Amino acid sequence: MKVRASVKKICRNCKVIKRNGVVRVICSEPKHKQRQG
C-alpha cells in the first residue's frame, strides 16, 4: 500500500474508487495498491 498525494492508475487492471471519503486504487497487482493521504 502506497500513500500518495496524487493517486494514478499504473496499469490497465487498476481501478480508482472512493471508499469512506478516501480515494484508493485497487488492482490485481499488489504493488499497485495506493491510497490518498
UniProtKB/Swiss-Prot annotation:
UniProt similarity note: Belongs to the bacterial ribosomal protein bL36 family.
Keywords: Ribonucleoprotein, Ribosomal protein
SUPFAM superfamilies, alphabetized: Ribosomal protein L36
Record NCBIfam families: rpmJ_bact (TIGR01022)
InterPro entries in alphabetical order: Ribosomal_bL36, Ribosomal_bL36_sp
GO biological process: translation
PANTHER family per record: 50S RIBOSOMAL PROTEIN L36, CHLOROPLASTIC, LARGE RIBOSOMAL SUBUNIT PROTEIN BL36C
Protein name: Large ribosomal subunit protein bL36A
Position of the signal peptide: none
GO cellular component: cytoplasm; ribonucleoprotein complex; ribosome
GO molecular function: structural constituent of ribosome
